[in-house]
Amino acid sequence: HHVNARLQLLRENAFDQPWLPALTVGVHGKFNDGIDDINAGTKGAVAGGALTSLAGIHDASGVDFTLYASKLFPDLPRPVLVNLGGRATKGVWNGLGGFADDYALLLEGNVVVFVTPNLGLAVEYKQQAREYRSIGNLVKTAGDWWTIDAAYVVNKHLTVAAGYGHFGNVLNHTANGVWGITLKYEF
């Protein structure tokens, strides 16, 4: 479960400065109701508090803080949008693996090329904290995440997107990526 709040501190090109990016801060509350069950072994996944002993994961909830800079470059042969930011988090795999005791400062960003006014191609990168230590073939050190996506804006309300996401090393380390498609309708 996620609850997000974002505030734009500075608009792009503010103060008539064409080089100035937009700056946005965010607070992101996260809750993973399955962590306590996994850690206790009640679902048969990992027993005996292994998440706590492997990575110091004690919590099923946490709060992330973000700062992002975004800049559109419309005068290139095709318009390009660049987003670069930092995330302060206690989350392991964005909270999917629970929450550790200490914050880590992680980099993330994406680049979108607008092939047409309605079609965009994007790549994204998310650095991941290295909370888990490698234990033979059972647990591997976490790897960074990346995605490749294509999105088509059908109209001002509907967007269709498809892509591939690679999630580094996860505990099962056999299914580290996934193809996906989304339909987004905004009122």
Question: Where on the chain are the PLM-derived regions?
Answer:
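Hydrophobic, lipid-facing positions within transmembrane beta-strands of outer-membrane proteins
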Residues: 1-7, 63-67, 105-109, 119, ...
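Outer-membrane pore/translocation modules
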Residues: 1-103
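Outer-membrane beta-barrel "beta-signal"
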Residues: 3, 152, 158, 174-187
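Outer-membrane beta-barrel strand-turn architecture
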Residues: 9-13, 19, 73-77, 113-119, ...
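Transmembrane beta-barrel strands of outer-membrane/channel proteins
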Residues: 23-29, 82-88, 109, 123-127, ...
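Outer-membrane beta-barrel proteins
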Residues: 34-38, 91-95, 130-135, 169-174
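Glycine/small-residue-rich hydrophobic helix-like segments
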Residues: 110-159
